[in-house]
Amino acid sequence: MITRRTLMGSLVPALAAARLAGKGRHVVFVVGDQEYRSEESMPAFAKMLEAHHGFRCTLVLPRNPQTGEVDPGVSDNLVGLEALDKADLMVMFLRFQELPDAQMKHIIDYAEAGRPIVALRTSTHAFNYQKNLASPYARYSFRSREFEGGFGRQVLGETWINHYGVHQQESTRGVPAPGMERHPILRGVKDVWGPSDVYAITTLTGDSKPILLGQVLAGMEPTSPPNPAKKLVPVAWIKSYKGARVFTTTMGHPGDFANDGFRRMMVNACYWALGMESKIPRRAKVDFTVPYNPSPIGFRKRK
């Protein structure tokens, strides 16, 4: 028998879900980086966005064309990119992809239509054309001269330069950029730290504005001292592209996602990119909804 108590009990989760700000918004994660275990961190992050914030998330992962299995060593096959055609937001974590034109078209059409993007770490060098140089999309390659600096520099704000912090020896402490302490993306964000090393950034393009600066630490612990020989450089910034909001961070090591402050910044960035900054909670909920024990970083060859 359905009682008032059981009816109210069944309504509580439904009402809570209805109140989640992201309800009705579709986020597509485009993933494939070979080194930083994005195939593990992005699914966990997507589940968190769905459970705590109501966004509907779709994952597009690199798949072995023979087996159909997720394979981070694959850099030429992202099945399911047509989901971008009706997406509200693209979250990308890519590195050195050279996709078939039919797949690449969905990514470029999305960006060139002026639609919001959130990008992580190696996405500054998302594409690397070495085989199909006649492709109309080869101009988006990270060392492109025709479209100077390719997708990374033109769309996101910078391409790959080099490591600034020593890789796997110097970690990163996040410091709000001057004047950005009250920016919505940093709402409730404290104590950002991660084992990712700071990338070298020369000049951010267009209307880019740093949000978070990276302090190079002389060690791999949150308590490691700063390296006094290395200045602070941007590790997260905002800009526009074709009228759309773009957020980019060069953080994204799987260990970075163990940090509440970093996860909260990423959640807030999704809200901001969608023009929903008024909906960003004072302290966004960022608890993982699945166990998060990422594998060590390192390159994985195609299976």
Regions found by a protein language model. Name each.
Residues 50, 56, 74-75, 86, ...:
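Catalytic beta-strand/loop cores that center a nucleophilic Ser/Cys/Thr
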Residues 92, 97-187:
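A glycine-rich, often tryptophan-bearing local segment used as a flexible ligand/cofactor-contacting loop or short
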Residues 24-25, 40-41, 51-52, 218-303:
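Extracellular ligand-binding/catalytic regions of CAZymes and related secreted enzymes
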Residues 28-29, 34-126:
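Helical hinge/lid and interdomain linker segments adjacent to catalytic or ligand-binding clefts
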Residues 122-123, 214-215, 250-252:
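Short, well-ordered beta-to-alpha junction loops that form the rim of enzyme active sites
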Residues 1, 18-28:
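C-terminal segment of N-terminal export signals and the immediately downstream linker at the start
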